[in-house]
Amino acid sequence: MRRKAGIRLIGTLTFFAVSCLQGQGEQEKVHSFYGRPLMGILASQIDGDQASGYNKFGYQVGMATGYRLSEKKKFDVIEMQFCMVQRGSRRAFDPLTMVNAFHIKARQIELQVAGIRKVSAGRLGAIDLLGGIRFTRLLKIEESEGYNPGIASDFSQNGLILQFAVGSRVSKVLDLRLHWDYSVLSALSQSASYNLFYPTGVYHNGVGLTALIRFDN
């Protein structure tokens, strides 16, 4: 049921974004909407799970819709993203220390509201600085390499993640963004039992590269 609801919501937002694209001119006009499909790769980890480094590769696929403000505002654009995201963490078996391997996969829907400021970066030209907050809803979490049967009940279904990004237009049809995000709240539920995998609380942490496809110039 959750997966079907998520698919319906993605479809609705996609239809809205495509509708916004109709009638867009060759220049970005203030007080106008835009919509752009996005896809990205994510190197993630879960701080507090006793693994180190960005050890789990994930992804995000979704849609960004935005509204362009006048140049006199603090933000040039207010943008909303709706994405299907896979995060998690992974640790390989170490024969020297005999630590157990695990591979946590968390699939969730994420809705982000962000402000974007366009600034000049010298020879690099204009770049976008983005700061936003992502509201997350956990759809499914599983352990595929270790043994943790209670993992689904240990993790909270709802969460908050901060994201900061730097973006640039690299072609007529493509923007690229390098982003970093971190949980505002622990990803564990309040009723989670003590577990050796995450004794001090866990926080989603990730860096990624996302491409946004332009239909407007």
PLM-predicted stretches and their roles:
Residues 35-39, 61, 78-82, 113, ...:
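Membrane-embedded beta-strand positions of outer-membrane beta-barrel proteins
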Residues 45-53, 86-107, 137-157, 186-202:
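Flexible, solvent-exposed loop segments that connect beta-strands
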Residues 39-45, 84-88, 117-119, 133-139, ...:
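Transmembrane beta-strands of outer-membrane beta-barrel pores
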Residues 23-68, 140, 206-217:
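Short glycine/proline- and aromatic-enriched beta-strand/turn motifs that initiate or cap beta-hairpins
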Residues 31-33, 53-61, 84, 105-111, ...:
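Residues that define the transmembrane beta-barrel architecture of outer-membrane proteins
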Residues 30, 68-73, 120-124, 171-173, ...:
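Outer-membrane beta-barrel channels and translocator barrels
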Residues 75, 83, 87, 161-217:
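Predominantly the C-terminal beta-signal and adjacent terminal strand-loop region
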Residues 1-31, 216-217:
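Cleavable N-terminal export/targeting peptides
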